[in-house]
Amino acid sequence: VIVLFLAIEDHRIAPARLAGSLHSAGIAVAALCLRDSMLGHSRYPFRLFELPTSRSFRGLAKALEDAVSTSGARWIIPGDEQSVALLQFLRLRRNVAGLSPGSMAVIEASLGNPCFFDACLLKSNTLRLASKLGIKVPRGFTVTSVGEAVARADDLGFPVFLKESFSWAGLGVVSCPDPISVRQAYIVKAKKRTMLPIRDLFRSLLGRHWYPTGTSIDIQSPISGQVVMFCGIAARGHLMGGICATQLECAYPQGPSTAVRICHEPEIAAAAEKMVVALGYSGFISFDFIKPEVGGEPVLIECNARPVPIAHLGARVGVDLGVFLADYLSTGVLPAKQICSQRSLEIILFPASLQPWPGLQGMCRDIPFDDPALIEFHLAMHPDLALAA
């Protein structure tokens, strides 16, 4: 069984770490990525296809066609949001993508229901769908002007978050303690939109209009509690298995986790399964929830239609997501029910695991000793990094 990673961004950890896990599960991994990237330095891909420097969808589609047909891949795993957006674009515009029927069939098998692509990628649409399913979401509004942003923030009560619908790793989120900060944050984001009609024309001419721009801006109330993520693998709207993890440390406020506790959260797993069924989803997926400090239902805050940095850890707690995928691709048979880990493990994630963490003494460290080039690549990118003993 062969799968292809598509990774447009060069720094993502999850695809590189997951490649080893899939290899251990009996899956052969090919990769279409930048050669000088985290995934490009992994020893596990049996074939590395060079991602073109141009971001024209025609060039990217040609590279994808070559990678799929040459490798014999039956499944594509997007490694980042840009890769998700590109695959969705090619699927929806099959008549102009220039892909063979065989490659298009692989894309179709690797994605969810096209009717719900936006709900996989855009935060506003994710929360709208979740709310319809009876899953609790933050109080909030989509806003279209600075005046509306300030008024809605005042309705919610300060502080609030101002969020871009297409963003990741907390980079599109601004914490606003008062009306002035809401106004300033909205103006900054709105400025990027003033030239959008002209920019979109040029992007269309260059074949770069697959990348989402001008997506909605939301105002949301913050929620006190712990971040709990659910990472799973699905096929045809059936969630085969997953793991939950509570965030113990993060890289920066609203940023990615650096240390987690893998745990059993049946209510969160059930909500994730509801979303997967509604999306008709196929592939690796994760959902971030806030578990309120004072009790009550977990609150869904976002969806990531790609592997996240805990995706390869399932084997440590008896729920190997790679094995689920290998079994499905080998047999076409889906497990009768979702299987989630009920074991616990506290672990510092790579690459944070290379650093000393005085407050996290005795915790397991996820270090890719089996793939040392990943360590070397990260250290070369961060030569001043203080290392753990």
Residue map of PLM features:
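Conserved metal-phosphate-binding beta-hairpin within the catalytic cores
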Residues: V277-H312
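Glycine-rich phosphate/pyrophosphate-binding beta-alpha loops
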Residues: S167-G170, L248-V260, N304-G318
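Phosphate-binding site of ATP-dependent enzymes
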Residues: I187-G255, I262-E273, K291-E293, E297-V299
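Peripheral (often C-terminal) accessory segments that flank ATP-dependent C-N-forming ligase machineries
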Residues: V323-A389
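Short Gly/Pro-enriched turn/cap motifs at secondary-structure boundaries
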Residues: E164-S165, I219-I223, V276-G280
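Active-site nucleotide/adenylate-binding loops and adjacent lid/helix of ATP-dependent enzymes
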Residues: F117-S216, R236, P266-A270
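ATP-binding N-terminal substructure of ATP-dependent carboxylate-amine bond-forming enzymes
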Residues: V1-N113, G147
